[in-house]
Amino acid sequence: MSTSETSSYTPDIPSEPVTKTTDTIHIELTPNDLDSLAATRFVRSPSAGATVLFIGTTRDSFNDKAVSSLSYTSYAPLAISTLYKIASNILTKHACTKIAIIHKLGECPIGEESIVIAVSAPHRKAAWLAGEEALEETKDKAEIWKLERFEGGEGVWRANRDGKVGERVDGGIAGLLGRIEVFADTNV
């Protein structure tokens, strides 16, 4: 779903990080600055011969339009669950050692980190493939949205993935509400 919003709209952002961590997976949605070094430390392991770190930063333009700011929001319980499933599947598929996916919520100034993904694996090819897949799956599936504000005040909410301004989220708001309902029913 995508809508134009007034610049005065403020999404509900948790004041503290929301996390889910095991020995091999760390998932975090945070209003704080992202710590790529902490993500790298988490995935470090004596059994890993490779560590891949991806740091996504906010751009100052989208489709030749000047972006003045970005703000991220999510339905945190569902997004944490989705990100954990993504990480778990990637660990198994690529025989990785550990993975961390950390995403910024709230205002994210231009040039600042919005996502950090760290992956370790016994061999570099698996780590490279896993890191890229983690990013693409996160952008495609995680319940995270961004408000892009453009120079001149116009703002557009859209899915947290590359695409066209105003690109509709699959299933629209009805699809999202259905996913939240199913999540709530299975996690009561």
From Swiss-Prot:
EC class: transferase
Region Disordered: start-end pairs: 1-21
Sequence ranges of Polar residues compositional bias: 1-10
PANTHER family named among the record's database cross-references: MOLYBDOPTERIN SYNTHASE RELATED
Function: Catalytic subunit of the molybdopterin synthase complex, a complex that catalyzes the conversion of precursor Z into molybdopterin. Acts by mediating the incorporation of 2 sulfur atoms from thiocarboxylated MOCS2A into precursor Z to generate a dithiolene group.
UniProt similarity note: Belongs to the MoaE family. MOCS2B subfamily.
Protein name according to UniProt: Molybdopterin synthase catalytic subunit
Species name: Phaeosphaeria nodorum (strain SN15 / ATCC MYA-4574 / FGSC 10173)
Designated gene of the protein: cnxH
